[in-house]
Amino acid sequence: EAMQAGAHYVGGLDPTIVDGAMEKSLDTMFQIALDYDKGVDIHLHETSPAGVAAVNYMVETVEKTPQLKGKLTISHAFALATLNEQQVDTLAGRMATQQITIASTVPIGTLHMPLKQLRDKGVEVITGTDSVIDHWSPYGLGDMLEKANLYAQLYIRPNELNLSRALFLAT
């Protein structure tokens, strides 16, 4: 119904925890996107092995379905913070080839997202907030410059050139 009303993306949320059927949930989401020639934006908060399995399944689906290339955004993707450097490199190469985007809130805390590593491997990394009143975190301001600042503090060696490069995240 939303697609017929003009939505540009079909979305989803934590296919294993919320839906209890990861493959069925993702297959349905991708099929709707294919039926309407639209993009996919899934909010994946799962950090368990189920989150890694969901990321791998989505990448494999895009690899097998050329019409989905450049049309998948994985928001949050916290499962990537559970991978080692070599695993991130391998997955990032596949994601870059398929033009898969990672949208991050640049979280701080126990999870350290490999955002710089993903970007260095050619993955498009963008930022956002869940809303101005962030229901997931009391620290949400809805300020993209604040996200670029946080990214710079976490991932960039401080010099003028490198700091100016952090603005990609806010623009």
Question: Language-model features: where?
Answer:
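Histidine/acidic residue-rich metal-binding segments in metalloenzymes
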Residues: 2-73, 79-100, 110-127
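Electropositive phosphate-/nucleotide-binding environments in soluble metabolic enzymes
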Residues: 23, 52, 85, 89, ...
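His/Asp/Glu-enriched, well-ordered alpha-helical/loop segment
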Residues: 60-72, 116-171
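Structured catalytic/translocation cores of nucleotide/phosphate-coupled proteins
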Residues: 101-102, 171
